Design a protein with these regions (language model features):
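Alpha/beta enzyme core
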Residues: 2-7, 11, 19, 28-38, ...
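Acidic, Ser/Thr/Pro-rich intrinsically disordered transcriptional activation regions
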Residues: 14, 21-22
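Residues that form generic nucleotide/phosphate-binding pockets
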Residues: 25
């Protein structure tokens, strides 16, 4: 074979592709059920399985139905679950106080899941919008601004309540500046040093969130989220976030 006088043979990467066994041996990425995260939408009550029209195949589930669904997924090898609450309007207020209430059905469901499936990995959602009467991820001022600093202690209190309920991972999805440090400090000070933070580091002000907000009935009552979520036109900004 002509090698153009080079002291080495040309690369022949096809050697590692010539049969299924070799391809399997050299495969870098393998996807297994235990690597998947199953998002589940929960509501208060019993016997509820409410289909979500904008998310075909998904339903809002009450505690009993959700536990049954987790058992079905568990038997398929799925071990990681992320819970999202749909909160009734009468429980919402401007400071999202229901998010850390002892009567919060979301926290109760988390405790039930961990009691029945103690080896599962359970992930939460930390943001004000499911609990806020304004439908925003932060405190809304009288002139319509999102108050970043007033929001941070609320997120921290929410995160601690979720850790106490048994969540293994806290998932801040609010896009407030500085929230990770504040949440980490609050978790550590409350004895939850082992609770992880799995944050939404790059969340865009995108129409693609429409079906999700419909699932949780958490769309903003006024304005939009463009002052705290990222501009979809900016790619490199995600690295800074």
């Amino acid at each position: 074979m002509e090698t153009l006088g080079l002291p080495f043979q040309p690369s022949r990467p096809r050697r590692n592709r010539r049969n299924a066994a070799i391809r399997g041996l050299t495969r870098e990425t393998r996807l297994h059920p235990e690597q998947l995260i199953y998002p589940l939408f929960c509501v208060d009550g019993a016997g509820i399985e409410d289909p979500i029209g904008t998310l075909p195949g998904m339903s809002r589930l009450s505690e009993d139905k959700l536990l049954d669904e987790i058992e079905r997924a568990w038997n398929l090898g799925i071990r990681n679950f992320c819970l999202f609450p749909m909160v009734q309007d009468h429980l919402k207020d401007k400071t999202a106080s229901y998010s850390w209430s002892e009567d919060n059905f979301y926290l109760r469901i988390a405790r039930s899941v961990k009691a029945r499936f103690p080896e599962c990995s359970l992930m939460s959602d930390v943001a004000m919008d499911p609990y806020s009467s304004d439908g925003h991820d932060g405190v809304v001022t009288e002139d319509g601004r999102i108050d970043n600093e007033a929001t941070l202690p609320i997120l921290a209190r929410m995160a601690v309540a979720q850790a106490q309920a048994g969540f293994d991972w806290i998932g801040p999805s609010d896009m407030m500046d500085g929230r990770i440090g504040v949440i980490r400090e609050a978790l550590d000070e409350s004895g939850h040093q082992d609770t992880g933070i799995l944050a939404y580091t790059a969340k865009y002000a995108s129409a693609f969130y429409g079906p999700f907000r419909d699932a949780l009935d958490s769309a903003p009552k006024s304005g939009d989220k463009k002052t705290y979520q990222m501009d979809p036109a900016n790619v490199t900004e995600a690295l800074r976030e």
